[in-house]
């Protein structure tokens, strides 16, 4: 019998899941959005209830000084767990709407925790939770998520120690527009950063968070972040001809912060596997990898249909739509690849993931998608002279 009654209703006024940024909709009040992945709700860790933006999965606060302490930093307080605060696109400075920003960051982080849990990023896999119950892994490692962090601008980052130590996200303000913009309000940036935690915990196992620190593997770390951010923002009206940017709202630039848009069109985005030969920066390499995964997602949507429900529908552990299936296969691949993998090894890990999950039902679809940008059967890794293959 539990000492704490975990089941307390909560409400968050935020940009809902699937809305990437303020250009896509308006804040709405969302009640009790957690899933079974958060049995204590988002505002309890099973031992204590918190009338603020703290719980089992995350602790969200502002951090204007950019310092490393967080526990005594400012958070909105709401004894009735109604986190409803004003925001307007003309409000300035961002600190004037810090309650809204912290709530939004808390919501997006928790919502992504719950989605990834459904795909298998759970306690035993090394996820970010204080209280793991008796479900394996190491606890005491929620995500420390800082809104309006003063240690930088026009960027964001996520630090991932091994399982059992908290991850730390720093979200910055962007000085690219007047008034300045708060990166917390662009869900894709939050998702990109949290995905560093996912990939670093899965690749090489949760006890080793140093398996994505080579140039090519570090590039894929950036690419996975862009891929999940983009897959989550897809809309029902989208088709394989829909192009997406990364970071466009925060950067105040329709092209976003990458060299090319994410597009299945090789004229719009000409990146190929051999493009990596001339790239020396992880975000550039990541854009190549995410472009391949964007192609893969649309190939699986064409094969299985696309659903735009917030949560996947599973049958025998398999997401029943191509969008969520791509997210599941890509995530499973992270855990199957070697430490510091290259593109060829990561591709093979996704094929292995499909074999384990569906008995290779999508083998041809996956090969064809990767071959499109030169990561086909004959592709070979060499740090200075990669060989492409369209077959």
UniProtKB/Swiss-Prot annotation:
Binds 1 zinc ion per subunit. CDD domains: M36. One of its GO terms (biological process) is proteolysis. Zn(2+) binds at residues 192, 196. The active site is at residue 193. The keyword Metal-binding applies. It comes from the Eukaryota. Residues 1-9 form a propeptide. Transmembrane segments: none annotated. GO terms for molecular function: metalloendopeptidase activity; zinc ion binding. Its EC number is 3.4.24.-. One of its GO terms (cellular component) is extracellular region. Glycans are attached at residues 173, 243, 385. Secreted metalloproteinase probably acting as a virulence factor. Belongs to the peptidase M36 family. This is Extracellular metalloproteinase 3. It comes from Trichophyton soudanense.
């Amino acid at each position: 019998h539990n000492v704490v009654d975990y089941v307390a209703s909560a409400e968050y006024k935020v940009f809902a899941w699937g809305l990437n940024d303020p250009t896509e909709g308006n804040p709405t009040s969302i009640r009790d959005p957690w899933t079974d992945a958060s049995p204590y709700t988002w505002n309890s860790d099973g031992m204590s209830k918190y009338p603020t933006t703290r719980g089992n999965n995350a602790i969200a606060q502002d951090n204007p000084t950019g310092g490393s302490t967080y526990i005594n930093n400012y958070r909105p307080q709401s004894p009735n767990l109604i986190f409803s605060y004003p925001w307007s696109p003309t409000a300035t400075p961002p600190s004037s709407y810090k309650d809204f920003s912290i709530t939004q960051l808390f919501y997006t982080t928790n919502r992504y925790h719950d989605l990834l849990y459904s795909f298998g990023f759970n306690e035993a896999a090394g996820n970010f939770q204080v209280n793991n119950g008796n479900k394996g892994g190491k606890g005491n490692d929620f995500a420390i998520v800082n809104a309006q962090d003063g240690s930088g601008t026009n960027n964001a980052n996520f630090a991932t120690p091994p399982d059992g130590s908290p991850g730390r996200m720093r979200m910055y303000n962007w000085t690219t527009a007047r008034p300045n913009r708060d990166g917390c309000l662009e869900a894709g940036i939050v998702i990109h950063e949290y995905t560093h935690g996912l990939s670093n915990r899965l690749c090489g196992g949760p006890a080793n968070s140093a398996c994505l620190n080579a140039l090519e593997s570090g590039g894929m770390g950036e690419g996975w972040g862009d891929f999940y951010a983009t897959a989550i923002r897809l809309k029902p009206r989208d088709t394989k001809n829909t192009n997406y940017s990364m970071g466009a709202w925060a950067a105040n630039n329709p092209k976003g912060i990458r060299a090319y848009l994410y597009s299945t069109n090789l004229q719009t985005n000409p990146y190929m596997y051999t493009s990596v030969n001339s790239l020396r920066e992880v975000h550039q390499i990541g854009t190549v990898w995410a472009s391949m995964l964007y192609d893969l997602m649309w190939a699986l949507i064409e094969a299985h249909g696309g659903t735009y429900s917030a949560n996947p529908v599973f049958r025998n552990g398999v997401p029943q739509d191509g969008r969520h299936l791509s997210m599941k296969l890509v995530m499973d691949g992270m855990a199957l690849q070697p430490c510091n993998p290259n593109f060829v090894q990561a591709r093979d890990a996704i094929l292995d993931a499909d074999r384990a999950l569906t008995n290779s039902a999508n083998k041809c679809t996956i090969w064809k998608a990767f071959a499109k940008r030169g990561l086909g059967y004959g592709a070979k890794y060499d740090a200075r002279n990669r060989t492409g293959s369209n077959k």
